[in-house]
Amino acid sequence: MPININKFILDMERFDGTLKKYPEDFIVEEITPEGTVLEVGKEIGFEDVEKWHGSFIHFTVEKTNWNTMDALKQIVRTTKTKRKNFGFAGTKDKFAVTTQRFGCFGLKKEQLENINIKDIVIRDVQKSNKKLRMGDLWGNKFTIKIRGLDLSKKEIKRISDLKLDYVLNYYGIQRFGLIRPITHIVGKFIYERDFESAFYTYCGTPISETGDSLEARQLVDVGEFKKALKLFNRNHDYEKRLIQQYLKYKDFKMAFTALPPQLNSMFVNAYQAYLFNEMINKRFEYGFDAKEGDILEDNTPTGTLIGYNTEFSGGIQGEIEKEIVERENLDLKKFKIEDFGNFYGTRRKMITPIYDFKSSFENDIFELSFKLERGNYATIVTREFTGNLS
């Protein structure tokens, strides 16, 4: 089951290079709703609210080689509090240097300021009366280095002269799984209420594993769950939770209740994203200028994230959307899934602007800098040059 990312905006010969050789090669700086860039290594000095009700504290987390969820787990463990006391505006990947805002309640500023975790810096601690929620950001600024290029001066000039004002608004590989792109497959099985297949796909189905991880997944595939548990390491916490819950209740659907609700939602979201990416591919041949029947956002055609309350476009775009629904044999009402969530069916722009795009060459390194609105993926920009998603 592909992830449906196969069209390009730039008409060019793409070059080979190494992305993310070091975490410092991929810098992600969150941008607040007010437009403030949380710059690496820089104190912002957010002001406390005048009349604090003693509820919420917001703070910036700068981290190297930590993803959002793992960093949060460590912060929770260090402060000896509960996961539900924390929130964040957006998620960030692991192999990078990233900044982002977190929020919490039930803690003192001093507790946060005194946290000492390797490769994590906490600063800009601010008293607030507002809960920080997912989506409370404008977007992100990216500074990316692609190494190991062997290009002629002519090729360098050609690439340096390229202007990239927008990209196809694909969901990136992160939505489906960087190492094991199976999240959308699990999501499809959950939509179909085939929880057994969802379980085996997530816990078994080895793809690129080696060693104990490979053997553990092979054991899952043949039903040797207890043996698999002994081989999965701490990097496979969710697999272990699923298996332990299944062994306790002997029920595949019940097993998924051991996972965080956000993760269970992400499975179905990934299936929606997979279908959306296909809409972009099908719309590509017709162009992305507004056409009769389009539902527009900022004068840009949108596609539907198929859900229980989907509003179909008219015209060509509507035909594309309905064709995919019919091929997948989807019953929209089934996107209300007990214990997993109600997946409404929003819309998303099929192309997205790039802001403040800059590029430069130095020695064998191509450096890109740009800003994207929230929900958009930097790897979709870099693949325009390299052709690769990772």
From Swiss-Prot:
Q: Which Pfam families match?
A: TruD
Using the record's annotation, list all stretches that form the TRUD domain. Answer: 166-353
Q: Which GO terms describe its molecular function?
A: RNA binding; tRNA pseudouridine(13) synthase activity
EC number of the protein: 5.4.99.27
Keywords of the record? Isomerase, tRNA processing
Catalyzed reaction equations? uridine(13) in tRNA = pseudouridine(13) in tRNA
Extract the SUPFAM superfamilies matched here: Pseudouridine synthase
Q: Where is the active site?
A: 93
Q: Which GO terms describe its biological process?
A: tRNA pseudouridine synthesis
Q: Extract the InterPro entries matched here.
A: PsdUridine_synth_cat_dom_sf, PsdUridine_synth_TruD, PsdUridine_synth_TruD_CS, PsdUridine_synth_TruD_insert, TruD_catalytic
Coiled-coil segments on the chain, per record: none
Q: Which family does it belong to?
A: Belongs to the pseudouridine synthase TruD family.
Reported function: Could be responsible for synthesis of pseudouridine from uracil-13 in transfer RNAs.
Name of the protein in its database record = Probable tRNA pseudouridine synthase D
Q: Which organism is it from?
A: Methanococcus maripaludis (strain C5 / ATCC BAA-1333)
